[in-house]
Amino acid sequence: MTDVDVAKNLHQVLECLPDGVRLVAISKYHPAEYIQEAYDEGQRVFGESHEQELKVKVATLPNDIEWHFIGHLQTNKVKYIAPYISMIEAVDSLRLLREIDKQAARNNRVIDVLLELHIAQEATKYGLTIDQCRQLLEDGEWRKMPNVRIAGLMMMASNVDDEEQIRREMTIAADFFDEVKSKYFTDDD
């Protein structure tokens, strides 16, 4: 038993989620014991942001865990996570997308990705501008990458107290998502 009631905390969060929403439990910096407790309660999707920590956890925890890589990913680190990562949640360049495709192919896998948008008005955030993302999709090179599947978009709102600013940024992201889905992914769910 750990000093944190993982099961209680997990169930409190799960009770608040709408139908159809899957929780990605952020496990970075948390010991394997906490992850195992969440796993024992039925949680199967976990998010990590450091490849060394992820490698250790993959080796010691159940092999049916679905691992997501969250946060900024350097191109030279893709080869270390490609054997076991299910999704990369922050793809911020065509160069990174190419490397993910290359490393996924080397591991005979398809890796899901989310294209990261930089909408927040903070220099500390990564991502593609809407115009850059639109251009990446329009150019179509991603369609020739059989080992990568663009599963959606992600963005981080500005870390501010101004709820109106956050709403505006989320509205921009939602509107762009609708545009992307209707223009490039009409045959997908």
Predicted regions, residues:
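Conserved alpha/beta-domain cores
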Residues: 1-189
